[in-house]
Regions:
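Charged/polar, solvent-exposed surface patches and flexible loops
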Residues: 6, 25, 29, 257
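Short coil/turn linker and secondary-structure boundary residues
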Residues: 2, 94, 139, 247-250
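A short acidic/basic microdomain associated with nuclease active sites
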Residues: 25-59
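Intrinsically disordered, compositionally biased, charge-dense segments
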Residues: 1-10, 255
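Charge-dense, extended regions
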Residues: 234-263
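Active-site beta-strand-loop-beta-strand hairpin of nuclease catalytic cores
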Residues: 45-47, 52-72, 244-245, 255-257
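Catalytic cores of nucleic-acid endonucleases
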Residues: 11-12, 29, 35, 65-229, ...
Length: 263
């Protein structure tokens, strides 16, 4: 049986793919001379390429990031964290672009996570806590409550907001200069190499990080036994923008007007 969280994650992923297909279909149907929408978007993630749609116009790259809404989730998953190397590793596959962006922002929380682990290592019974090497981690139930009371958990469970400069730099590195957002339209990011009559994207990405304990009951083999709980780390990104464009690539008539086929 699927968990509700997994169901929602899969539903969001399907909604994103459906919107990519809608944009690709509209770009094909518009029949703009010189506009090649590229390959049809498909399920699964690729570590190569640039943008959700790799189009071209008159032989020039027209790589486009596609987001279904202006409050779109940018992927999310549970992460392992290694205290020694400071490396975050996703427990499941996700879009490489979104993954890189999430991890870049998540690194801002490394110090707070390290402080949590350092404090956890000093909890009683020390012989079982001192070997904590990262996340997931296991601590005594009493220790979990103490870490929360002392403010270590709250410092991790805070949203991190990134500026539009962060977004621009992230996508421009991959040769992506355009983003189409459902119900908001087409924007350029940083540069506008095709000189399209669209505005610059104004927005931010909010990274939501949560260290959460499971409901499962565990223990340490002391005498008497010490009740314990395990915790995992989840990171979720969300695009937030109030920008509006006069053109959207999900609309055939907009595409024709954008490229001067119709006035």
């Amino acid at each position: 049986m699927k968990t509700f969280q997994r169901y929602m994650s899969e539903s969001v992923g399907q909604a994103g793919l459906d919107y990519e297909l809608k944009v690709h279909k509209a770009m094909l149907a518009a029949k703009i001379p010189g506009l090649n929408p590229g390959d049809k978007p498909g399920a699964g993630f690729s570590n190569v390429g640039a943008g959700d749609i790799e189009a071209s116009y008159n032989g020039k790259p027209f790589n486009i990031e596609i987001k279904a809404t202006s409050n779109d989730q940018m992927g999310g998953t549970a992460f392992r964290y290694d205290y020694a190397t400071k490396v975050f590793t996703p427990v499941k596959e996700m879009d490489p672009e979104d993954l890189n962006l999430l991890m870049a922002a998540a690194k801002e929380k490394s110090k707070d996570i390290d402080n949590y682990i350092k404090a956890a290592r000093k909890l009683e019974p020390v012989q079982y806590h001192k070997t904590i090497s990262g996340i997931p981690l296991k601590v005594s139930k009493e220790g979990r409550d103490k870490l929360k009371k002392d403010g270590f958990l709250a410092k991790i469970n805070k949203n991190v907001k990134t500026s539009e400069r962060f977004i621009v730099r992230h996508y421009n590195k991959k040769g992506v200069y355009y983003i189409n957002v459902g119900k908001a339209g087409l924007f350029y990011m940083g540069k506008n190499p095709l000189k399209l009559p669209v505005p610059s994207l104004k927005g931010e990405i909010q990274i939501e990080m949560r260290l959460g304990y499971s409901g499962g009951k565990h223990s340490f083999p002391t005498d008497p036994i010490t009740p314990a709980r395990t915790a995992g780390l989840r990171v979720q990104g969300r695009l937030r923008t109030k920008s509006k464009s006069d053109y959207s690539l999900d609309n055939i008539e907009d595409i024709k007007k954008l490229f001067g086929i119709e006035k």
